[in-house]
């Protein structure tokens, strides 16, 4: 499968509204999901835009394919940024569950391959600025949508 030029990929776009104080504009495409809890996703960010503030609840690996991915690690207790890492094309990372962070595309956006392994059905939790859970990505819901053809 060509991840760079593939008109058959189905993209789901996410944009923020006035309730967020940072620009949200990114898309996700489900590449693969297996009964053993593994999920492969391709994400792309618009230039200088974020995805939702979140915590991974699954074991996660990622590889930047194009552009830059700016990752801000956040202290969940204080909300302060602990560090910022700029990942460039070719950069690979592996994280255990629990990592709280913000991600945004660089000046030209970003294209990133994510490989997750669900633990207890959960993949990630979207968070408000104060750390309150405002949404959750669940393995069984994604699997059901895939089987239904959505």
Task: Go through the PLM ranges and name each one.
Residues 36-38, 47-49, 68-70, 99, ...:
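Short, charged/polar surface micro-motifs in flexible loops or helix N-caps
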Residues 94, 107-125:
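A short hydrophobic beta-strand segment most commonly corresponding to one strand
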Residues 28-30, 40-44, 61, 84, ...:
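Conserved hydrophobic/aromatic beta-strand scaffold that supports enzyme active sites
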Residues 35, 75-106:
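Short acidic-glycine-tyrosine-enriched beta hairpin
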Residues 56-78:
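Glycine- and acidic-residue-biased ligand/ion/polar-headgroup-sensing regions
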Residues 55-57, 105-108:
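Short glycine/proline-enriched turns and hinge-like loops at secondary-structure junctions
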Residues 1-37, 81-85, 127-150:
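A short, N-terminal "cap"/entry segment at the start of jelly-roll beta-barrel domains
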Residues 39-56, 77, 87, 96-98:
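Conserved short histidine dyad/triad with adjacent acidic residue
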């Amino acid at each position: 499968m060509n991840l760079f030029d593939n008109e058959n990929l189905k993209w789901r776009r996410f944009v923020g509204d006035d309730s967020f104080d940072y620009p949200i504009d990114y898309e996700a495409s489900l590449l693969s999901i297996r009964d053993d809890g593994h999920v492969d996703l391709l994400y792309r960010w618009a230039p200088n835009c974020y995805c939702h503030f979140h915590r991974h609840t699954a074991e996660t690996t990622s590889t930047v394919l194009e552009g830059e991915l700016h990752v801000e690690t956040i202290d969940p207790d204080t909300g302060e940024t602990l560090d910022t890492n700029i990942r460039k094309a070719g950069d690979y990372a592996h994280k255990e569950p629990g990592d709280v962070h913000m991600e945004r595309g660089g000046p030209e956006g970003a294209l990133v391959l994510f490989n997750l392994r669900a633990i207890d059905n959960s993949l990630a939790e979207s968070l408000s600025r104060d750390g309150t859970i405002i949404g959750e990505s669940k393995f069984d819901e994604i699997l059901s949508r895939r089987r239904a053809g959505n």
